[in-house]
Amino acid sequence: MKYSYYPGCAQHGTAVDYRMSVKAVFSRLDIELEEIKNWNCCGALHVDDRTTRVALSARTLAAAKGLDIATPCNLCYSNLMRANTALVDGVLKNLVNEALVTKYDGNTKPKHLLEVVARDLGFTKLAPKVTKPLKIKAVPYYGCLLTRPENKFDSPENPKSLDNLIAALGAEPVRYYYKTKCCGGPILITDEELALDLARDLLVMAKDTGADCIVVTCPMCHLQLDAKQKAVESRFNIKIDMPIIYFTQLIGLAMGISPEELGLDKHLVSTDKLIAKAGK
């Protein structure tokens, strides 16, 4: 399988560990990710001008050159999906293409890397790669953007793909009612107090389930729940100590890849206890 690969800005900044695990895992799954040359930001959280916002993603979609485009970031995925939907409008499409060197025909399909594993590869083909089934409990956290706007990949309200992946790796996906609730990352800069409130809700519920970790699919969610976890503990005078790991890191552990190659030593919340328990 081969995809045009759009890493997004975070993989070259705050999510180096995610980038490491994507490279380690997908090469072993024989899935080729051909990184788009000279890619640009998707527009991130919000760009007021609609034409500019859509054009940023359309430029990336046009660069896919006939392949489906895969991305590891929920925000990038959502923006690519929204751009595709918006470009059904012929007037907008013409305006956008006037600004692009490579015109976009509207036929590129964006996919999140979770969809690539769960649907395109499938758990049957993944199974032989799982050499060290994980004996842990894990929270499946999708975030607020992976299944929105609504698409055919998974349910926007009660998605199951990450739950099923966790189970396929030998771990137990715990029941988690906040699986699609916002982590607070998008408002961290403008309203840190509210952002920490939202993060606290997610972390406390995860702790109450008895889970060993929270599994995420988004670099912004990881940044909020890992890097800001100490701030949550300090603000609310509580102890969380909950490792936050990417789904690719979870796959890598089950495949027997070293924690260092997966970037698990780069997290702010220690993953040592999780790694030890997963390997028992």
Regions found by a protein language model. Give the residues of each.
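Iron-sulfur cluster-binding electron-transfer modules in prokaryotic oxidoreductases
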Residues: 1-280
